[in-house]
Design a protein with these regions (language model features):
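Helix-loop boundary and gating motifs at the non-cytosolic
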Residues: 6-66, 107-109, 114, 123
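Hydrophobic alpha-helical transmembrane segments of polytopic
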Residues: 22, 85-88, 92
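Generic alpha-helical transmembrane segments of integral inner-membrane proteins
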Residues: 31, 64, 68-71, 90, ...
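Membrane-embedded alpha-helical segments of multi-pass transporters/permeases
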Residues: 38, 71, 97-101, 124
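Membrane-helix boundary and inter-helical linker elements of multi-pass secondary transporters
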Residues: 48, 77-79, 100-101
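Helix-to-loop junctions at the C-terminal end of transmembrane segments
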Residues: 68-82
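C-terminal ends and interior cores of transmembrane alpha-helices
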Residues: 90-104, 109
Length: 125
């Protein structure tokens, strides 16, 4: 009997650790994305001198991967959900990091669609 209770205690500790880690990661992602979202509008206006129409077009293109999210997730069905989410977060991080290097509006479109693919992969998991 003690063997079962030891095993259950270890499982409970691992589960608690995983939930704490998950909570911390969700907080960090949410905080970082909130900072990005608030700075992005100013970056478009002040650095890239984008018009409201340009912003609307960019936002429209950014949502295309969202429409294709089920198809993207379906192609990765052989992977575990946690791996797909990790891939999505990595793509999002690289894309958002590359946003600051966009010297003009045209590269920004590609970068935004790129990180949107990762974000929508993550969000579907």
């Amino acid at each position: 009997m003690p063997l079962d209770s030891d095993h259950e205690a270890r499982q409970a500790l691992l589960l608690e650790r995983d939930w704490r880690l998950f909570t911390a990661l969700v907080f960090c992602f949410s905080f970082g994305f909130a900072v990005y979202s608030s700075v992005f509008q100013n970056y478009l206006r002040d650095v890239l001198h984008a018009s409201p129409e340009g912003l609307g077009g960019l936002e429209s293109l950014r949502e295309i991967p969202g429409l294709l999210a089920a198809l993207m997730a379906g192609t990765l069905v052989a992977l575990a959900e946690s791996h797909i989410a990790a891939i999505g977060l990595a793509i999002t991080a690289v894309g958002i990091g590359a946003t600051g290097f966009a010297g003009s509006f045209a590269p920004l479109i590609g970068i935004t669609v790129f990180w949107s693919v990762g974000f929508h992969l993550y969000a579907t998991m």
